[in-house]
């Protein structure tokens, strides 16, 4: 795959007031953001990002999974329309489904296999096929050495992890210390979620953990290892902190978290040193998300002003 900077940004589009895609791509370039996550193959965005050298993660949305799982021909058609049609785009991954849950999980591995087969047949096997999971699939996340999937998640994650190991692809996970903390603020010091703890909070054998981000990443590694995925890398497909709409959701806290995230991911975790490929959620505040914190994850307002200053 193309070389990657450790930090990208998720370009979500659940809003009716965003700038044109070509303008957004210019904002990525101006701010030195080298990687972009798209949740679906948006034509305007893919046309605009072609030839820029920006690495792209493109989603095959949840509503196409059953179709992609049902037939290799459907997957080949999807790849032709959404990948091969954009030869100038530096595609890095196709992310098949985002936080797929319930009965739909039965389509995950068949869809991933069919998309992978279609990419290989098109001479595009360097574009890896993965899926993006929620941190909620971890039944145990602390200490990281005890990390494991919930019983329900283990049933579908075993085959997912084994497919990723076979194809040398990473698992993508959406990791939100804010949400874990806000769910039960009395159970955890906010500094541990915010990259602001003064020392080791969780001691795990020889390893000391100062922040919940590292704890969660390493718990995912332990959980994957229990299902034949000890060779699989983790990519953080979303992380961030909201600037409004909820408890401790302020521009100052959001800036503190995201700036520390950017500065931190180049170093890795206690158990897995080295850069962690990470995508900040999100480029913009999105006004068609649920009210509250969901509308307030953006680095920018739709008018292109910074919600708070940040340095990539």
UniProtKB/Swiss-Prot annotation:
A GO biological-process term? carbohydrate metabolic process
Signal peptide (UniProt feature, chain positions): 1-6
The record lists the catalysed reaction(s) as: Hydrolysis of (1->4)-beta-D-glucosidic linkages in beta-D-glucans containing (1->3)- and (1->4)-bonds
Q: Which PROSITE patterns match?
A: GLYCOSYL_HYDROL_F17
Keywords, comma-separated and alphabetical: Glycoprotein, Glycosidase, Hydrolase, Signal
Q: Name one GO molecular function term.
A: licheninase activity
Give the pathway.
Glycan metabolism; beta-D-glucan degradation
- Residues carrying covalently attached carbohydrate according to the record: 196
Which InterPro entries does this UniProt record tie to the protein?
A: Glyco_hydro_17 (IPR000490), Glyco_hydro_17_plant (IPR044965), Glycoside_hydrolase_SF (IPR017853)
EC no. given is: 3.2.1.73
Q: Which residues form the active site?
A: 99, 238
The keyword Ion transport appears for this protein:
no
Question: According to its UniProt record, which protein family does this protein belong to?
Answer: Belongs to the glycosyl hydrolase 17 family.
Function recorded in the entry: Functions in plant cell wall hydrolysis during mobilization of the endosperm in germinating grain or during the growth of vegetative tissues.
Spell out the protein name for this chain: Lichenase-2
Q: Which organism is it from?
A: Hordeum vulgare
